[in-house]
From Swiss-Prot:
Present with 31200 molecules/cell in log phase SD medium. One of its GO terms (cellular component) is endoplasmic reticulum. Its EC number is 6.2.1.3. This is Long-chain-fatty-acid--CoA ligase 4. Gene3D superfamilies: N-terminal domain of ligase-like. The FACS motif is required for catalytic activity and substrate specificity. GO terms for biological process: long-chain fatty acid import into cell; long-chain fatty acid metabolic process; long-chain fatty-acyl-CoA metabolic process; sphingoid long-chain base transport. It comes from the Eukaryota.
Amino acid sequence: MTEQYSVAVGEAANEHETAPRRNIRVKDQPLIRPINSSASTLYEFALECFTKGGKRDGMAWRDIIDIHETKKTIVKRVDGKDKPIEKTWLYYELTPYITMTYEEMICVMHDIGRGLIKIGVKPNGENKFHIFASTSHKWMKTFLGCMSQGIPVVTAYDTLGESGLIHSMVETDSVAIFTDNQLLSKLAVPLKTAKNVKFVIHNEPIDPSDKRQNGKLYKAAKDAVDKIKEVRPDIKIYSFDEIIEIGKKAKDEVELHFPKPEDPACIMYTSGSTGTPKGVVLTHYNIVAGIGGVGHNVIGWIGPTDRIIAFLPLAHIFELTFEFEAFYWNGILGYANVKTLTPTSTRNCQGDLMEFKPTVMVGVAAVWETVRKGILAKINELPGWSQTLFWTVYALKERNIPCSGLLSGLIFKRIREATGGNLRFILNGGSAISIDAQKFLSNLLCPMLIGYGLTEGVANACVLEPEHFDYGIAGDLVGTITAKLVDVEDLGYFAKNNQGELLFKGAPICSEYYKNPEETAAAFTDDGWFRTGDIAEWTPKGQVKIIDRKKNLVKTLNGEYIALEKLESIYRSNPYVQNICVYADENKVKPVGIVVPNLGHLSKLAIELGIMVPGEDVESYIHEKKLQDAVCKDMLSTAKSQGLNGIELLCGIVFFEEEWTPENGLVTSAQKLKRRDILAAVKPDVERVYKENT
């Protein structure tokens, strides 16, 4: 009999659902907190971890010494004519990593909490505190300070637009907001509406002696503060350092106000890929349990000697949970930035990966595909004999042939050094990744674990346990969750086939969306099961495999369904594809791929096809049909090699000239596609492709 990693706990309620299942190690009782912890609130948990960590370094970060500007002129084809366009590239000069011990983190947590109370923020849930900032040590310290006073935190992505920011600030009646200096300019308009906000705290001093980027950082922040004061002269503005100093001086007069397990710790707004963001109310009980669930699946594998690098948005539950896991492991958490992970955008210093040398790295599919394609580009630049040697050793490693470990250590050494040289585990979460990408990075760098979860469950659902390592699955149920599958009859998924919509129960699951009873009612069954909206199946070993989201399954003209996210994860693994949105018209048989091309690989192809000569800018030739057809042909080869066929094969592609970023509103901060907006931008081109292939 096949070994089982989850077991049924009870009988199926009816023929339209499977029996509920749990991780086999918690079959009798799911966890409600981390193993070996007695904490019931996030404050208790942080204090417990920091006390245990003592004089060990718990947190590390880099400060910006300067930002260097370089202007370049590129030629771009506009309306059929070549037009010179000037672009500015920014390069960051950073300090080495600065560290703080766990003991010092206790002091800072309390100082910030007392500082907030002293300036007028009320404790014990009476006021809410908004964080609108990029991931940094100051983001986390501010969050911890709020926890020490029972102040619920409202999170918003640093890329959130004005309407979303106003919605989250007004709906929650937040009285204070922490932000980055460079985001202050985004506050003036929202603060006209959000009259409830009385305090603004910015992450760095606004100092006229700050000459970084030729004084632009100071001037931009100063102008933004002046604008805020103009529209809201009643608002009090402080720097992060000022709050700490105020808190230190108030040590003997401001008490700590401890939260209760059932108190809201965080109202986390979903990224809003299809509409107005919903505020997920997560209690201290929920989040502490969530940390326990994820930690359960890797216990004994990650610990105090590990170095965990942090760069994903902290406004995303995936990152917030894993940073608290780092405290639980008593490792050191090193803050980084997507722009400076590699030396590509740094000056006079190493990139964050080479400087910090992490052993554990958490990322999303878009990050890992970028890493993979960057490695492939470097391999393709090698002489022919070197490429042959590389792929020969890779094939040996993939087949676990004796001595392949020694050979791969020598051949892959330089590639591994680009990520710091010490990685033991990498983790993908947030969205699906192709099996090809998981295999490639697992063999080249270290094992890639897979995580799956939702904001509503504190990222708890599945984490692939290292001893159960496999490809193409979402992983093992975490230690806090009970799960079952229910029929989705109209899509052809039935529990009798071990397929259906995935439903959860457990301590991490939230109980409501903030001030949104309609969405809350729709998300839960009458008997309290949370509907994930994801279609899944039980594997023969009792692990979970995600097929797609219900809303991303589209019925085509012949009546069959295609799974958009599944297709995107596979086509995205093609070297010519940086990102892709698969669009399926219900009145057509096959889908169209809307593709953001990988310009480096595309440039090489254009030269090989004789479309351009070396030195020219491939962006000028992006609409050449010969180039698009060649890329589409290669993408179809990728699809067929990974098992796609029939209606899953694209009938054609459209190139999208602009990268999809949260700033231009084409993806969320969690890198989820805003499908309607992407399609709207290229609808005539998509219709042309369909017409040509009908």
